[in-house]
Amino acid sequence: MIADKNIIQQKILDIKHGRVKQGLKMDIPEIDEHLRLKLDGTLNLAIGHANVGKTSLLIYLFTLWAKKHDLRFVIFSSENTAQSVARKIVEFRLGKTIQESSEVLISKAMDWCYNHFKIIDAEKIYTYKTLLDEVQAIKDVWDFHGILIEPYNSLSKDYALYKSYGGYEYNYYCLTEFRMFAKKNNIAVWVNCHGVTDALRKSWGANHEYAGLPRALQLADVEGGGAFGNRADDVICIHRQTTHSQDWMFTQMYVLKIKEIETGGRPTSHDEPIKLRMKINNVGYEFLGQDLFFNKSIKALQL
């Protein structure tokens, strides 16, 4: 079908006159300059090495967005139990561990969690299609704004398609399906991906402050190849120097790709990522000494 000229012209004029809908902010200018949550049918990737805290940060961001903008999300985390995911949401929401919290507070936080999140209990193996079918069934009865799928490589392959397309084209097909699902339902789809083995061998040069330690992933380092970066709207890399004597508690977030800068956000400099300091017991993050969750506009423990 040929695109409608009037619709195209209207969208161009919207850009000209600043009427384009902006991605949602955290109200921290240094972060909002680079990262926005865009809900109007976007496919987003989070990439990074194993054991750097990708899942932890992503769940934290989803919890932050849920509270700040009253949003609802679905989480599919096949390498974590539903209990562990819910626990992280509760601890992030309370700003302290469950050991430090009363049963009354935990109960209130669980109610909040259940109202804003639906967690898919990964007790069976999913393909991309069976997962999307289940998510669509949830969408039909419980309206939500975004979904986290992680990790991508935990999804079983549809071998009929895999045999027809081959590995590289199969990934393109799956990513296209994710993208179309996001557009159809007007939601944000986030997919968490690992890096290739060779990326583990890449380290910072001798003159770098992290000399000899693993480098952050680039788009070409994603397991499955360039299809992922090519197909996604926005891409972030989550990295942490886990063996550094002092900076192990800092999570570095590189914004590698922003497809539509008109809606907010832009890539970070390769040597100036967004650095988030992990709070004690990993119950949240701080940026330049400011707690991202419990700032002046979000009171601690107010449910």
Map each language-model feature to its residues.
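The Walker A/P-loop phosphate-binding site
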Residues: 1-95, 301-303
